[in-house]
């Protein structure tokens, strides 16, 4: 029994379930001399095959359990498969029995069938990956053919028309408000003119009453003048009668001339009295006329000053009313503009709040996807760690298996003439060193599509076989 050559092809580092296991870089140990090769342990990418006439059952059992733990159930694209392989054989049948070579051949056949099954499942996974990739390409191509740009133009035109209509409605409302304010202003002006007309009519009525009083006073004075004239005429008549009576009395007497002072002329005296009365009456008439004219002038001055003051006040009131009206019109226009701007602000806030809500939903969705990606990355890292530990354990068991095989080669030597077991105590330890380069690949997958792929080269590792 010669196990002088050991060749293995294995992935340098297990990969997460999203990639196919048992593929990647390979390492090969050719440190054992070529002259000692009789049986072989060979492998292809994704497989391990062992040929040996006899293997201890404990080693085979340990190797099968390690291989089963290193190849867990994996899933991809909705299909899953799980496999486990068990090796069992009696130690006496493998080491000391006559059918050790057949048992090892059976073991190799079962392992080959298992690896063939793994390869078929990997091929099935590749087909499913291709179908999924084609489906995503078709879906992506279908979505790209839809062009909504013309709808965006129509929406923009409709939004512009709505905005123009709103502005036109605001202008019409502003014109209506201005017309209402102008009508109210004209109504206020009419009411003010009405009040002014009533005030002027009242003033005219007052002046008419004063004129009537003045007319009555003038009539009274004229009546007094007429009375004075009548009294004067009566006095003149009485004087004439008295003069006639005196003259008649003097006509029947004897004319006696007395040397004395001349008597006063009565006619002249009466004439003087009449002139005095006439002057007094004329003076009273002039005084009455002067008083009347003075009172009329004062009254006219008071009326003119009052009318002027009233007119000035009314003019100021009208100017103030016009100013108030202009300010009210400007206030209404500003209020209408404020309402229109508030409406536009509310529409803008509502539109941008909806946009912000959509963006927040998108952010939450992306955060959820990112958390899922992180969880998936952590899960893949854990699976990677488990597979790497299984790989390390498998390599250790393979190294132990090789040492045991080489030890069994020295212990058990059979003679062609004497089919007995010869025990020979030899111990050979071969510890080749294999340097592997480790490369970590991180893929970011969103909706089944690879978004980004990063490779991180690691430090070289030394494996003692």
From Swiss-Prot:
Residues 409-465 are annotated as: Tail. Expressed in skin. Residues 270-408 are annotated as: Coil 2. Residues 100-412 form the IF rod domain. Gene3D superfamilies: 1.20.5.170, Single helix bin, Vasodilator-stimulated phosphoprotein. Residues 1-28 have a biased composition (Polar residues). It comes from the Eukaryota. Residues 99-135 are annotated as: Coil 1A. Residues 247-269 are annotated as: Linker 12. One of its GO terms (molecular function) is structural molecule activity. Residues 1-47 are annotated as: Disordered. GO terms for cellular component: intermediate filament. Keywords: Coiled coil, Intermediate filament, Keratin. Residues 1-98 are annotated as: Head. Residues 136-154 are annotated as: Linker 1. Residues 155-246 are annotated as: Coil 1B. Heterotetramer of two type I and two type II keratins. There are two types of cytoskeletal and microfibrillar keratin: I (acidic; 40-55 kDa) and II (neutral to basic; 56-70 kDa). Type 1 keratin. May maintain oral mucosal cell homeostasis and tissue organization in response to mechanical stress. Belongs to the intermediate filament family. This is Keratin, type I cytoskeletal 13. The gene is KRT13.
